[in-house]
Amino acid sequence: TDRTMRFDFVMAGNSTTTKVFPVSFREEPFWGGSLVNLIDPFNSGNFRYEIFDAVTGKLIYSRGFCTLYQEWQTTAEAKQMERVFQEVATFPFPKNKVNFVLSIRGRDGQFSRLYETAIDPASYFITREKPEASLATRIAGSGDPHTSLDIAFIAEGYTSAEMEKFRNDVKRMAEYLFAEAPFDKYK
């Protein structure tokens, strides 16, 4: 579909343990990822999530990723205490029931299942709120959202009265960015 399923969850633990706790599922109105390359070909990252058709077991989506949580696990603090880190997994909103599988890469390079849950796209528990419209200004580009890269600049530190200055600063930054490779070819 052309919508997104957003799964918010937390990773918790210490230097030697990792647990996953679900927070929420949310339907978002647009899918900004590829409609063609749904299976991650690179097998990169310390974590991977996969979406399987619940009836056939067929893999229909996968993505590898790394987390700040796993970096924190290597610190001295992680040897003395536990912490919780928020994470998000997004994937095309499923048409039918699916199984979500989150795996962690071991020291041997192999993935093992860390968390699994069934998802029914018709579930009452999936939040379906329409997001509030936000004020945004397009600086450059007009490409297909499935094949384009979106870069958002947040006006943090600018007051409402300084929005024109903010837009001019962003335009200037975009000019610098699009003057450099590889962005100069893909504007």
Describe the predicted segments one by one:
Residues 1-87:
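N-terminal prosegments of processed precursors
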Residues 44-48, 97-99, 148:
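Exposed beta-strand and adjacent loop surfaces of beta-rich binding modules
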Residues 50, 101, 152:
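Residues in well-ordered beta-strands of folded domains
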Residues 57, 108, 159:
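Surface-exposed, flexible loop/turn segments at secondary-structure boundaries
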Residues 63-67, 114-118, 165-170:
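"Short basic amphipathic alpha-helical interaction patches in structured regions
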Residues 79-145:
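Extended acidic/polar, glycine-enriched regions
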Residues 125-184:
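Fold-level signature of zinc-dependent metallopeptidase catalytic domains
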